[in-house]
Amino acid sequence: MSHLKLDTLHVQRSPRGSRRSSRSSGRSSACSSGSISPVPIIPIISISHDGDESESESEIETEPARLFQRRMSIKCTNNLAAIIKEGFLLKHTWSFQRWRRRYFPLKRNMLFYAKDEKCDVFDDIDLSDLCYFECGIKNVNHSFQIITPTRSLVLCAESRREMEDWLGSLKTATAPQRPRGDSFLIEQHDILSNHHHWYATSHARPTYCNVCRDALSGVTSHGLSCEVCKCKVHKRCAAKSIANCKWTTLASVGKDIIEQADGSIIMPHQWMEGNLPVSSMCAVCKKTCGSVLRLQDWRCLWCRATVHVACRPQMAVACPIGPAKLSVVPPTSVHSISTDDAWDVASPKGNFSPLLVFVNSKSGDNQGVKFLRRFKQLLNPAQVFDLISTGPSLGLRLFRHFEMFRILVCSGDGSVGWVLSEIDRFNMHKQCQVAVMPLGTGNDLARVLGWGSSCDDDTHLPQILERYESASTKMLDRWSIMVFEKAIPVPKTPKMSISTEQEAMLTGMVTSANHHLRFIVETSDTQTLISSTRNLCDTVDDLVCRISEHHKDDEQLAVKCEILRQKLNMLLDALQEEEMGAHSGDDLIATIRSLIARSIPVTPGSSAYLLNPNISIEKTEKDQINTKERRNSRSLRSSEKEALQCRANSVKRAIYNVVEHSEPGRPKRYQRKLSITPFEALKLPTTASGESSPCTSPLPIIPPINIISPTMETSRLTCISPLPDTRRDSVDENFFNSINLPAPRQFADSRRSSGVPEVIQEIEEGANGETMYRRCRMSLTGGANIDDAGNRLSPCSDGGENTPTERKVDFLRVPIHTGEPIVDPLCDYRPHEVFERTYYMTREMDKDKEKDKENDKTVEIDKEKDNCVAKEDSIPAERLVHTCNLQVPGVVVTPNTQNVYSSASITIIDTDAQTTTEQSSSDDLGGEASDILSAISNEECSVASEIFDKQDAGQTVGDIIQNMDASNFTHIDSPETSDETEAMPGESIMDDISSVLGHDITYALQDNTLTDDTTTLCSEHAGPPKPPRKKSLSALSRTQAHPRRRNSSPPRIARLARMDSDDNPQQFGFENIVFEIDNRCDDQKMREPPRYCSLAQFVEGNDIARQSFKQLMLEQQQRDGDNDTEYPEQQQTPTNKGPNSLATTSEDELSAQTAIKIEIHDIDATVRNINSSMKPNTILTTSTSPTKKSGHGQDISVVVRPPTPLRGDSIKPTASLMPVSSGGAMAVSMNCSGMLGVRAMNASEIRRHSSHAPGLAVREFDKDKDRRHSGFNPNQLTLDPEHARFLSSSPAASRRISCGSLFKKKNKKIATKRSYGLFSVRFFVVAEPDFRLATLALIRPLIPLPNEALPNLQSLKGSKSSLFMGSTLFGFDHLASAEKDKDEKGGKDKDKTPTEETNRKLPIINPLVRLPNWPNLANGGGFISKCLLANADTLCAAVSPLMDPDETLLAGYHEKCVMNNYFGIGIDAKISLDFHNKREEHPEKCRSRARNYMWYGVLGSKQLLQKTCKNLEQRVQLECDGQRIPLPELQGIVILNIPSFMGGTNFWGSSTKKDDIFLPPSFDDRVLEVVAVFGSVQMAASRLINLQHHRIAQCQSVQINILGDEEIPIQVDGEAWLQPPGMIRILHKNRVQMLCRNRSLELSLKSWQEKQRQHSISIQRDASSTASEHANSTDEVISERECYVLLNFIEAVSSLVKWVKFLIISHPALQHDLYEVACRASEALESIHPQGKLLEGPSLRTKLVEVIDSSRQLYDDACTLLRDRGHSLILREDLETKLSAALANMEMELKKCSVQKCIDGKLRAYFNVLAPNEESDGRRKSRPFWVRLRSGSTAGQQAFKPPLTNTREAASNWSVNEVVTWLETMQLSEYVDSFLKNDIRGKELLTLGRRDLKDLGVVKVGHVKRILQAIKDLSEN
């Protein structure tokens, strides 16, 4: 290297830099860039990972030295182009295997690097001619090398994902410019470009470069190899290689395309030269090809055939593709990529089932990389995708146009779930079948499907592909994990947390800053404001300074600190502007100005550990707004207040941004909490007491005490389980206290506050047990008070304070006073039409209410009561009209009647509190009034049902709906019942009715005139009814006098007087129609039959998908008394005096009871009422049974028909459906829909059970959800096309209340008899698809339809989704139980008895639940709770909304993930989560399957000591199919879909008992198995023994309620995370086709293939013999091989003639004819070899015909003679032996001879060289010849043949065919032809040596060893 001139370097750098540059220039890969003179140096290329090459390539290779250039760039000149990727990588320094960390920015066609990003000078590399590849096969250290014509760099990334990102970025940087630059086109270009994919590797034999044809350097032939086509090149030659890699599409085939005459394209061979595998055989000449001395011969990349250069022209043109032809997508079939990013495919001829392969390259210690490359070599490279780099979407998009294809996922269970999720996204379930190759750790799904637990060897991949081709298909159930998370209000410190001193100090700083921000926004005291402002500035200053100490070089952190300083200054500016008006000139302004002038250091700070963001986010939005109202004492304008609050929010977010950026590696669960919504950034706390702030406010400060107090231990939450309160002992009182999900305006219910700050304050009830609700109304914007004229009202000046002892507070009335301009915080979520409509509706309703109030005779009583309330809140009652309030009916809870709380328009009934002698299992119920009210407000509190008054005749439907008051018709989950929502004024449940029933039915319903307080049902021992009846009449007359009034409730004081009367037995009023309150003495209860109740069904956690409304239509039952009706004709709504009683049955028949007796008291009066109003009064399907009543018209029996989903356009006006007659039975029967409503009703009362939680029903529409529809009001949930499709799509939609009942008991005595007649019971079912029939069923339930319109009940057998399946109220389960079980279980239980079928009805609960060690939840139901669902369908069918499980179960939830294998919560998820964290921290420790199992064992043992998930049963609740399951002490719950858990454990256990109540577990039965986990010891023991005592249930849906405020670990298919409190539902999502291994089919196919191969071998033998015959038939010359057979034939004939003649001579008594035959045979034999010489030419074959005929005759006659006379012959022993051998040889030789007639008509003889298997001498000697002759039959001969023995003696007698069979048994059939050509018999086989085998073509070392060992075994035997 003396020729190098170092003085030619002219780099203007420091001497150190110059010396480093000089040294670097001597080493090729270390050269950089810059303006530097080119220096010729010797390239030194090495890869440190392989460690194989210690010398440079130039020392071995003879090519001249290359010129390497080094260039440098200045930083300022490199800022012109955009940076594609930048980051730090490790760069190899080529000295002592060292690595240096360097900063690399990548731009288009240029790569730069320097020590760090702040360097001014960068080395640059031109990437215009780039070659990059991975280093090594498995590439453990994630290194890759880039080679250009001038540079070579080895770089190392931190992870394989980062390495893939860099390689992808290099593709992007070097790819040509495209108009569309998305990732799909980049990957598409990579697929279609035919570029090689290099990786560095070594070789075991000499290998040659395909570019320069020279040998690769080094002893191990180290170089680059293409992972697809195995092209070998030098590293220096990689950039010069042409793009001739394996074809992918038709375009890549190019000029090699072969097109036939018919236009079809033939798949040609794709040849690669040289480097053939060992022992390659030419496909043409069958000789060895390839060489280790040079690059010669060819191999096809598709069919793997090898040929010589000279034989290649003789090769067939069409390529057979190879053994994997069924799975390969030929490149000639893929024509192009269409506009939808999918292939345009032309299916090839023949069988075609393409295979799409996804490989996780990280799986199995990077074993996936080997499989990825192997698959690309076997298949089309465009069929194989790496999940790490491209994901599943690219491959699925490309394969979208295939009709059917298979998917092979080579990874663990997590990647399988990823692929299945993408299949869901593309909706490709029907066209793909998924198989799994186990490369992960657990591989549970692969175990269940039969593919084994692991697959580590890629050498047998072709055989594995054949297994997947013969696989069978099964359906895998997939389950949606739906979660409903609740916010955690107060964060709790982890139990075992170790905090550093610095972390605690920074946490205190952030907490202090948050408190000061609250004081600044909240306080009205000047001194407090000054102090808080100064402390805030000091705290922020200290925080920034401390963080900047450890992060001095972080520019981004410095920017965030600067933003924090600016936002703090903006806050001070806003505070100065705010206080300028009221406090001008005081010291506050001076202090603020001084603080603004101060400068906060800009230096970025160090990081603290992640602080919990919920320190100041624990309050709800309503507290924020209420606190803002209490701050009105400073008389600030609204805009200034909002500006100040926004500035405070900005400062708070800036503080969190600084802290978050200072520690980028914090857990994701905390980063999720840092996402602060705009209305949740600063939730200001309110004062907990009644004391006001130092600065007095004109408004009282209402204490924000929730009805659900966090301090009350006995309170109960609103649970979602339909179970009594006593079953929920572990419920957290804060559950769902802060749920508030914002919804977009397209989905938001306008009655709910989806993100709107709530203003309803909740007051804890005092000791008097009485709460009063004031009627209020809130403005439409939620922030301004508007009077009747639309002007903004001024704040009230009256002030007052509330003391904690004054409990009687109007807590629903909170006036809101704001400034001029107000920006609605939800303007983006609410349509503009809402504001206009609600504003005018509010103003009109205010005017109407003022007129009504003036005419109200009891207004003085109301004022008196209002004044009582005003004493507490200091607000005059007369100002209530002018205050923005919320319309809420009053409620007075009286402690006189236990569990019943009534008022003028609402009755609250505690359904769970036990009033009977049956005590609850909970000790917390009863006693304090606050406890009762706490339970009432959250569980039992229901609002008055809506009442329709009679409208004016001239009103239209729009007027009716627009003028409907919210107090008349109330949503079940409306603001009046929810402590979390507020209502928009003017809206009512009419919107929901319109959305469900349509405007026609809504208009028809309004004809009913229903009163509010008519007592219709009470105790049988009724008290004096006159006083309440008079009040009822007065209320009714007042209602008729004011038809415009929507609220028909009577005066409150009258109602209170009636409700407070202790001697009034009818105080329950209308409530008893729906509920029977058991509040009487025991003897009275024993005398009376039980009354059964109904319940308005809530969907768990939701509001029944927008369709919840409460309008009960009640039926009258026949009574024995005479006081049945009191006013039948005086008014349109007759009032019934006596109470109705439901038909009573025994308790066993209770669940099946459906009939209600409806009696028509006066037919004529009823008909007159019907004629006066043609509209139906209700939408109701009812049921009665035939009864008889004296003195009245004929009784009518009505059958309850279940509700059917309706389309709005299918509902017809009732007047047009049926003519009406003025009298007669037919007219009554045809118009009896009017009878159903011709009676007075009390205030509708619906019990709100504890299972009905308020929720948010968020409806997600289709892609056209944003499109406007004609006549669509955005504020009304009307029947738009989405709703219509929703109402009619699902056949499972129903209004049945008992769908989720826990009290379903099967009653097999249900009568299904039909009776016919005009007024007889007619029981029929309305078919779902028939909407016209459904309309008739709902609107006219008593119309006698023709028999042909009645569907057959037997048709329910085939309908799984029928409305009646699963409900015992209609008793249809027994019709289809067997068929249903057969359909769902695949017929696996078809042999079960009916009793067993009944016991196996899902859910199947473990009987161990009833044992004493399990908690008892079955005794806490109570009488009322059991009665609620008895006749729920019958009573509530009219008002029960259409509940579609497909819709309502998902409302308010979001899909977290999809479960394929199993779901775990508790200890198993904790172990998986710990392992996941360990793998993320130390991936090098978790690279092998065995090591991962070890880690699982260690972590499981850790949980054995720590018991982190102890007492999990107190933190979760479990429900299976809606039934609450009691839980013992456990640490986890596992829900299984497949019988394999966490690495092959059968956690459910195998069923061995015949009387097992559970179904056999399967993954295709739509059934889940629920298992309890008691500890890690049980999990370990379940791997060894069969455990079953931990089984819980089998069900079809699971719900888990997570209580408390702590997160619980959860895992799905091995992927774990921490789940916050809330609800989790596991529902069936769909099914996917999975490929299962079919071993029986594999065996059958293998045997069939073996037979086919044997048959092909025999055909080849025949063909070869026939070919030889035809080849010799032209010249009639006997070949050498035939001559050898001829000599044996002559020897056999001569021997037989000799011994037959000797036999005749020895026994003269034998026939002499045989001697003559022998003589003729001898003469014929002499004729073919006259004078000892064989004839030549065609005459020989002609003469041989005569010899064969005579020899066959001699053989036959000799055999016949010996068979006939053999028993009497006495032969010498030697003669016997010789004669037997002669006959046997003659028989064998005759089989080789054949006589054929030629074209010229002459007969010629031919010899078959490949004769059939012959019997060896050893077998012949075992039995004398004549004994075999005496057997007389061939069957006998075959029966006595001994088996072939592998002894040396037997082997020496083997023929060629037996040797061939021996080879085939050793699976060496490729050498059969060679052994046949060389005529290797048994004797020759035993003497074969290694050299002989080589001459026979056996060159593989393994095959040679196997053959030699087998020969040795034969010789030894």
Swiss-Prot record:
It is an enzyme of class 2 (transferase). Gene3D superfamilies: 2.60.200.40, 3.30.60.20, Pleckstrin-homology domain (PH domain)/Phosphotyrosine-binding domain (PTB), Probable inorganic polyphosphate/atp-NAD kinase, domain 1, Transcription Factor, Ets-1. Residues 1854-1917 form the SAM domain. Its main location: cytoplasm. Residues 350-486 form the DAGKc domain. Coiled coil: none annotated. GO terms for cellular component: cytoplasm; plasma membrane. Residues 1128-1145 have a biased composition (Polar residues). GO terms for molecular function: ATP binding; ATP-dependent diacylglycerol kinase activity; zinc ion binding. GO terms for biological process: glycerolipid metabolic process; phospholipase C-activating G protein-coupled receptor signaling pathway. SUPFAM superfamilies: Cysteine-rich domain, NAD kinase/diacylglycerol kinase-like, PH domain-like, SAM/Pointed domain. Belongs to the eukaryotic diacylglycerol kinase family. This is Diacylglycerol kinase eta.
